[in-house]
C-alpha cells in the first residue's frame, strides 16, 4: 500500500517543528551563556573599580598626612614582603578596639595615628562603607590591603612604598607574578587557581625639607 501525500506532509511538518524547537533551544542556551559571561565580566570590572578607588584612598591618606608618614613605616603596619595586611580574613592586622571600632590616636604618637588610618582603610576593604541587612557589601570578595615598603627608599623620600590590594575574582585568569607586589601581598592566602586579582600603586612621599 502506498503512503498518501497527506501523511508524508504531516511527517515532514513534524520534523520541521522538531528542528525549529532544537534550533530555538540552542539559541536560548547561547544567549544564556552570553548573559552569564557578560555578568561575570561586569562583576570583575566592578571589583577592579572598587579596588582602584580604595587604593587611591590610601594613597591620598599618605600624601595628605605627611607628618605621620613615619608611623606607617612601623613593622606592625607595613612590611617589605607583604606579610602585614588589613581587611578580610583571620590573619589581618587588627587595630580595632574591643567593640570593633577604630581607636582614637594618642596625641603625639605617630604610630597610633597611622594605625587609626590603617584601621579605617581595613574597614573599607571589608565593605563597611556600604551595608545592607546581611552585612557589608561595598568591597571586593576577600579583599586584603598591604603597604609594602621599598628599601632602600628613593633619595630624599619620607616614604617609598606600594599600596597593594588583592581580592578574589570569579573567573579563571592568570595570577599575578609571585614576586610582584600583588603576588607578595597576603601571599599565604589562597584565592584559588587563577582567581587572585591585584592592583598596586607606588607612592613616593618626598621630604620637602631636604628637597628645599
Locate predicted features.
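Aliphatic-rich helix starts adjacent to a transmembrane/signal segment
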Residues: 2-56
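Flexible, low-complexity segments enriched in proline/glycine/serine and punctuated by aromatic residues
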Residues: 18, 46, 56-212
Amino acid at each position: 500500500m502506498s503512503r498518501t501525500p497527506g501523511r508524508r506532509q504531516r511527517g515532514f511538518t513534524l520534523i520541521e517543528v522538531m528542528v525549529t524547537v532544537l534550533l530555538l533551544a540552542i539559541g536560548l542556551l547561547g544567549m544564556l551563556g552570553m548573559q552569564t559571561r557578560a555578568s561575570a565580566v561586569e562583576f570583575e570590572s566592578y571589583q577592579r573599580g572598587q579596588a582602584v578607588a580604595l587604593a587611591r584612598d590610601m594613597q591620598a591618606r599618605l600624601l595628605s598626612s605627611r607628618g605621620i608618614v613615619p608611623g606607617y613605616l612601623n613593622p606592625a603596619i607595613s612590611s617589605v614582603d607583604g606579610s602585614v595586611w588589613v581587611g578580610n580574613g583571620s590573619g589581618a592586622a587588627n587595630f580595632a578596639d574591643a567593640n570593633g571600632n577604630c581607636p582614637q590616636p594618642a596625641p603625639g604618637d605617630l604610630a597610633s595615628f597611622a594605625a587609626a588610618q590603617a584601621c579605617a582603610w581595613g574597614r573599607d576593604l571589608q565593605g563597611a562603607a556600604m551595608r545592607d541587612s546581611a552585612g557589608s557589601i561595598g568591597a571586593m570578595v576577600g579583599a586584603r590591603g598591604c603597604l609594602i615598603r621599598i628599601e632602600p627608599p628613593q633619595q630624599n623620600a619620607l616614604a617609598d612604598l606600594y599600596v597593594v590590594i588583592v581580592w578574589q575574582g570569579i573567573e579563571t585568569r592568570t595570577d599575578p607574578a609571585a614576586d610582584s607586589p600583588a603576588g607578595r601581598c597576603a601571599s599565604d592566602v589562597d584565592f584559588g587557581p587563577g582567581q587572585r586579582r591585584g592592583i598596586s600603586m607606588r607612592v613616593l612621599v618626598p621630604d620637602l625639607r631636604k628637597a628645599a
